[in-house]
Amino acid sequence: MARITPIERYRNIGICAHVDAGKTTTTERVLFYTGLSHKIGEVHDGAATMDWMEQEQERGITITSAATTCFWKGMEGQFEDHRINIIDTPGHVDFTIEVERSLRVLDGAVLVLCGSSGVQPQTETVWRQMEKYAVPRIVFVNKMDRTGADFLYVVEQLKTRLGANAVPIHLAIGAEDDFEGVVDLIKMKAINWNASDQGMTFSYEEIPADMQDMAEEWRENLISEAAEANEELMDKYLEEGDLTEEEIKVGLRARTLANEIILCSCGSAFKNKGVQAVLDAVIEYLPSPTEVAAITGINDDKDESEGIRSADDEAPFSALAFKIATDPFVGTLTFFRVYSGVVQTGDSVYNPVKGKKERFGRIVQMHANDRQEIKEVRAGDIAAAIGLKDVTTGDTLCDAKHIITLERMEFPEPVISVAVEPRTLAAQEKMGIALGKLAAEDPSFRVATDDETGQTIISGMGELHLDILVERMKREFGVECNVGNPQVSYRETIRGTVEVEGKFIRQSGGKGQFGHVWLKMEPNEEGAGFEFVNEIVGGTVPKEFIPAVEKGCKEQMDSGVLAGYPLLDIKVTLYDGSFHDVDSNEIAFKVAASMGFRKGALEANPVILEPMMKVEVTTPEANMGDVVGDLNRRRGMIDGMDEGPAGSKIVNALVPLAEMFGYATDLRSATQGRASYSMEFQQYNEAPKLVAQKIMETR
C-alpha cells in the first residue's frame, strides 16, 4: 500500500508546558480546527478529549501523554494536507518522565506559556529536557485575555531566564479583556478571529495606527534574524534593507531547525484566538522526519559498530517503543515511533534488547483514547501495537535480518518510597499483578519487597505520582491498599576488638552437651562482610565441629545486639577451645559459638549504622543558599558544588536516608519547583549517639 501523505508533509510534535499554561485547552482547539472533534472539550468541565483518565478529569491536570493524529491545510488552505502527530504531555514535576520519553521520539515541539505568569519553574525543567534532545521548538504565549497578560514581557523572560534567542512573529493587539487578535509581522496585517463561529473564520485587517511603529520595529528585528540564516539572504538584506515574505520564512525555518532562534506567537486558546496561526507555524517552521538527524544505534556485529537509520520507507524497519499503557478492553498497548522502513499487521519483528521475536497482532492509530485500526505504518509514523508480549519502554523493534539497537532512554531514579499492603489477604495476589502492570507502564515507578520487614515498597517521582498509582490500583484493578511509611534499613557493627569465651555444657546424666570455644572478634574492612578464620592447632576443637562454630557465628550476624538489625563487617577468629569425647557434637559447638559471639559483640563497642544517600541537587543559583541550609539541617555533609546546565548549580551531598523523607515536596516548595534532585545509596555510616538512642527506643 503506497504512502498517503509524503513523509515531507509529516510533523511529529509535542505540546509541552508548565501546569496551568493551558496546553490541553490548546490541544483541544487544534483537534477542533483540524476537524477531529466537532465539539470543543473544556478542561474545567472535565470533558477534554486528551485527558481521558478519570483522575485527569477530576484533578484537571494531564498525567499521561495522549497521542493523536490530525491533518492541516493552513488557515487559508494555502498548504497541501499535512499530517500532524501530536503528543500532549503533563506539566507537573512528578510526571516529567512522560515529557522525557515523548521528547525522545518527537521531531519538534510547541512550548505553551501563560501570558500572565510567563516562564515558570517547571518551564525550566521542560526546557532542559528539550535542550538535551535538541528539539526544534516554537513558543505559543497563551491566555492573553488574562489579567496581567503581557506578551513582550514573556518574550523578555524567555531571553533572561532560559537564555533563548526569542523572536516574535506576532504581536498582541490589546491584552486582558481588550485582547482582540494579533499582528502578523511577516504579512504586516492584523488578524481578527470571528467569535460567533468559535474562531473558525478570520479576517486580515490593517494594523491599528497606534501599533504601526512598534510593528515595524519588531518586523525589522524579525528580518535581521532571518537574514542570519545564510550569506545570500544577508547580502540581499544589506543591499536592499528588506526581504520578501518567502525569504523571511526560509531564513526563519533554517534557523529554527538549527535551534538558533525560538519563534514566538500569542493568543488565547480559550477565546479561540491564535491557535490556527500556531498550526501554520508548525508546518512552516518545524521539521519533517527527513529534516532531523538520522537516528543512530548499535549494529548486531562483533565490533558493535554504529548503525544509522534514515527516515526512508525502503530502509530496514526500525522503531522505538516509548510508552506502554494498559487498556481495559484490549490489554497492553505499546506506543512506538517508526524511524525507518514499513511494518504491517501480522509481521514479525525482533527486539534486540530482550533477544526475542515479537508479532504485530494489530496496529492502531490513537486519537486520545479512541482507536482506529490500520494495516501498516511507515517511517515517521507514531502508532500503538496490540499484542506485543515482552516489550518495555525504551526497547528497539527492528527487522530480524538487519538488527540494530537504538539508544535507550534514560529514566530518573525514583526519589520517594512508601510501603503498601492490601486491605484484605485475598487481594494480595491481585495487588502483585496490578503493581507489575503499573511498573511495566512507568519506568520511573519501582516495586520491591523488603527482605527484613516483608513489606511491599513502591517508589516513584513524588507523592502525587505515588498517590495516583495507588488510586489507579483501586480504580482499574479493584485493589484497595493501606499506605504506610517505609522503614529505614539500619545495620549494626563493632568498633573494638575482644577475646571472648563461649561455653555450652549440659551434663546431668545420660547423653549430655559439651561445646567450648575461644573467639577473637574485631571489625573487618568496610564492605568486606563476615569473615571466619580457623587458627586451631593441636585439635583442641576437632575438625568436624569447626563448620558448626562458623555457622553459629554467622547466624548471629543476622540479628544485632543493640536493636536487632543485621551486623556488618566483622572478622571472627577461632583460636582455642575444648571438647568432650562423648558429649561434644555439632549442635553444642554451634550454640557455644552463638553465645560467645553475642557476648563478644556486646563487649566490642557495638554501634548502629545508618544508610547514607548520595544526593545531587540541581538548583538555580538564587536558591542555592536555601538548598545547602536545608541539607545541613538534615544532617547532610556537603561534598562540593559544580556548574550545572543553563546557569544552574549542582550541590553534591551525603545525607542519611532517614532525613530524606518528604524531601521532594520540601525542595519543591523551597525553590518553587525550580530545583530537581537524584538520590542513590552510597554507604553505611555510624549514627550519632542521640539518633542511635532513638532507634533503639523505637525497636
Swiss-Prot record:
HAMAP family: EF_G_EF_2_B. The lineage of its organism: Bacteria, Pseudomonadati, Pseudomonadota, Gammaproteobacteria, Alteromonadales. Its main location: cytoplasm. GTP binds at residues 17-24, 88-92, 142-145. One of its GO terms (biological process) is ribosome disassembly. GO terms for cellular component: cytoplasm. Catalyzes the GTP-dependent ribosomal translocation step during translation elongation. During this step, the ribosome changes from the pre-translocational (PRE) to the post-translocational (POST) state as the newly formed A-site-bound peptidyl-tRNA and P-site-bound deacylated tRNA move to the P and E sites, respectively. Catalyzes the coordinated movement of the two tRNA molecules, the mRNA and conformational changes in the ribosome. PANTHER family: RIBOSOME-RELEASING FACTOR 2, MITOCHONDRIAL (PTHR43261:SF1), TRANSLATION ELONGATION FACTOR G-RELATED (PTHR43261). GO terms for molecular function: GTP binding; GTPase activity; guanosine tetraphosphate binding; translation elongation factor activity. Belongs to the TRAFAC class translation factor GTPase superfamily. Classic translation factor GTPase family. EF-G/EF-2 subfamily. Pfam families: EFG_C, EFG_III, EFG_IV, GTP_EFTU, GTP_EFTU_D2. It comes from Colwellia psychrerythraea (strain 34H / ATCC BAA-681). The keyword Nucleotide-binding applies. NCBIfam families: EF-G, PRK12740.1-5, small_GTP. The keyword Transferase does not apply. Residues 8-290 form the tr-type G domain. Keywords: Cytoplasm, Elongation factor, GTP-binding, Nucleotide-binding, Protein biosynthesis. This is Elongation factor G 2. InterPro entries: EFG_II, EFG_III, EFG_III/V, EFG_IV, EFG_V, EFG_V-like, EFTu-like_2, G_TR_CS. It is found in: Cytoplasm.
